[in-house]
């Protein structure tokens, strides 16, 4: 799998840097259309922006205000594609917008937006919107603030509770199609030749320290590193001397933070899309994995991209706004069980309000900068990753001066949605006496048809059917499967991205680590030294990214 000498000696057509959703989507599209493809990711797949979103597959209702109708239409079409190609991961989500007399958008404006949203999603399978009177809204959300209520609007979008697993399934699909997909490989340098090409990419394995070089003279190099786009462009050199690829900054990231809380008094049964009182920015209160996901914020960000964290002020803002619309909640800092924050890789614009910066993606061809085989993605959303991949690969074929085969991803299901001989009902009959039914259902939610592969592990080693910790349905076989079949190399990979253990245990997953390490020692060959080192790194990761600062003082 990590055969660096072979990779070093392979001539690739397409080399993708960055393993977020747009990178793996591009690699998948390229591999499925016959390109010899390599993807390099310095951390884990979906370890950046793709992992820190609000977990919505949505059209972007808010973008209508900025007349980005093409973006909304494209997003709504891609929402429909994902509902069909990844139905185990992407589910319909009902959202309700309360309208108050202090709202910046009047009831009729919301209604007009809803009508337009329905028109732009003319080919949808989800229900159309409905407007609610104040009385109807209060019947549905009895604990919501009543003062000044003008009514509401109810509509449907999509939710991907396990966004990291969407990225992973696209990765596995790309790998199955022949792409070499490498996590924990950092790009250390881009060699710019005299012929205006990136001729070599110097890499280092982050796990072993091994260095190797990929020949890129015949390839098109795609930079899908999100907020790191400018940083990667800054790695170019010629004959050991730095060479500037771009003269101007391309990415102007904005930071979005979320908090996770337990169900609270008056918690809504379905999602709310609320306008914040303080700054008029819309945010979400969403039921998520038995808890509530609340966010997001939107602030310009120029800090470290590798350590992004919700500030105490952002946490206080989300708590206060939730308490304002749900007065019975009375949330405090002590109710926050988990936080996460990410950076949106938006185009750099000077002086524009963060919320008004376009969410349209840009395929930036660096031939205008004197590099003919490098394209950077600026922007890009979780929802539209497939479209981005298709556009990128069309462009790659054009630059290679080859005719592009048809793109198959519009209808091709992701691995967990492919036909599999073992259905949920069959699994219940076959394993119901050996495994808790709740755990079997949970496996099918996470892995879809691939749940059968995990159940096969349990069949071979029954102890792997035991829960990792009593309060969660996750079983030990998932740990083994993550390492053996899903390229997990660290405890953070396992608890934060292959499962959601870190986010739903109320202690950042710390209580699960000892048991997970025992499973890794027994079944995956981990040493005690390796376990101890990983536990330490796990604690560091949580302190740097997820545990509020006020809890660390």
UniProtKB/Swiss-Prot annotation:
E.C. designation(s): 1.1.5.3
Subcellular location: Cytoplasm
UniProt xrefs under InterPro entries: DAO_C, DAO_C_sf, FAD-dep_OxRdtase, FAD/NAD-bd_sf, G3P_DH_FAD-dep
Pfam families: DAO, DAO_C
Key words of the record: Cytoplasm, FAD, Flavoprotein, Glycerol metabolism, Oxidoreductase
GO MF, any single term: glycerol-3-phosphate dehydrogenase (quinone) activity
Cofactors: FAD
Chemical reaction(s) catalysed: a quinone + sn-glycerol 3-phosphate = dihydroxyacetone phosphate + a quinol
Domain of life where this protein originates: Bacteria
Binding-site residues for FAD, renumbered to this chain: 13-41
Keyword RNA-binding assigned: no
GO biological process, one term: glycerol metabolic process
Gene Ontology CC terms, in alphabetical order: cytoplasm
Leading EC class: oxidoreductase
Major location category of this protein: cytoplasm
Family: Belongs to the FAD-dependent glycerol-3-phosphate dehydrogenase family.
Protein name: Glycerol-3-phosphate dehydrogenase
Organism: Synechocystis sp. (strain ATCC 27184 / PCC 6803 / Kazusa)
Gene, per the UniProt record: glpD
